[in-house]
């Protein structure tokens, strides 16, 4: 089980996270309360022993290009309606690994219809990883019936409202390739060592 812990803001948080997780993420050029300056993102990327995703709601090629150049990012996580051509050009120009986020409703009136709509949207993108999320930093679970249907067709990373208490059940229901967490392993807005360790342990020990 691939485990990513997102939204770190300092080298101290990096030290906590990289002991346990497979990847982490830094939020830039976004309205998120976890956003950090590009210079700090670069420092974290340069000091990390695990992949660091540059996470943003940026849309245009020039915005992403500038951020990639200034941080040295090799991994990006796109939380916007960036065009498929933009993703293709970023991959071609910078050789970046792209995780593209897609929003899943919190409550679906028709899970099969929503899953098919998502699969159609996902198919337009040449993404290396697909993230199914409730919405940028919402801290809420999405409708797992939808993500489980999508996960039957393609490998997905699940995010939104995860914590050590629910991650095992979510994995059993959805059967994803991986999970991504941020606020669910924090205390007072800071990544907590015990919560991080417990989340990763539970996620990686699930049998399904």
Curated annotation (Swiss-Prot):
<keyword id="KW-0413">Isomerase</keyword>
<keyword id="KW-0822">Tryptophan biosynthesis</keyword>
<dbReference type="Pfam" id="PF00697">
    <property type="entry name" value="PRAI"/>
</dbReference>
<keyword id="KW-0057">Aromatic amino acid biosynthesis</keyword>
<dbReference type="GO" id="GO:0000162">
    <property type="term" value="P:L-tryptophan biosynthetic process"/>
</dbReference>
<comment type="pathway">
    <text>Amino-acid biosynthesis; L-tryptophan biosynthesis; L-tryptophan from chorismate: step 3/5.</text>
</comment>
<dbReference type="InterPro" id="IPR001240">
    <property type="entry name" value="PRAI_dom"/>
</dbReference>
<protein>
    <recommendedName>
        <fullName>N-(5'-phosphoribosyl)anthranilate isomerase</fullName>
        <ecNumber>5.3.1.24</ecNumber>
    </recommendedName>
</protein>
<dbReference type="InterPro" id="IPR044643">
    <property type="entry name" value="TrpF_fam"/>
</dbReference>
<dbReference type="GO" id="GO:0004640">
    <property type="term" value="F:phosphoribosylanthranilate isomerase activity"/>
</dbReference>
<dbReference type="InterPro" id="IPR013785">
    <property type="entry name" value="Aldolase_TIM"/>
</dbReference>
<keyword id="KW-0028">Amino-acid biosynthesis</keyword>
<dbReference type="InterPro" id="IPR011060">
    <property type="entry name" value="RibuloseP-bd_barrel"/>
</dbReference>
<comment type="similarity">
    <text>Belongs to the TrpF family.</text>
</comment>
């Amino acid at each position: 089980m691939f485990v990513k812990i997102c939204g770190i803001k300092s080298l101290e948080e990096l030290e906590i996270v990289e002991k346990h997780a497979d990847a982490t993420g830094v939020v830039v050029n976004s309205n998120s309360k976890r956003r950090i300056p590009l210079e700090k993102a670069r420092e974290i990327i340069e000091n990390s022993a695990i992949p660091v995703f540059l996470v943003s709601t940026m849309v245009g090629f020039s915005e992403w290009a500038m951020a990639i150049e200034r941080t040295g990012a090799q991994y990006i996580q796109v939380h916007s309606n960036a065009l498929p051509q933009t993703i293709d050009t970023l991959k071609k120009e910078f050789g970046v690994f792209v995780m593209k986020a897609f929003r899943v409703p919190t409550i679906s009136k028709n899970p099969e219809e929503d899953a098919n709509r998502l699969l159609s949207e996902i198919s337009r993108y040449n993404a290396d990883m697909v993230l199914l999320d409730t919405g940028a930093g919402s801290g809420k679970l999405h409708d797992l019936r939808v993500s489980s249907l999508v996960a039957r067709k393609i490998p997905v990373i699940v995010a939104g409202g995860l914590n050590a208490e629910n991650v095992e059940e979510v994995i059993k229901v959805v059967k994803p390739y991986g999970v991504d967490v941020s606020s669910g392993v924090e205390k007072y807005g800071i990544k907590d060592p015990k919560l991080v360790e417990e989340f990763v342990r539970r996620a990686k020990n699930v049998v399904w």
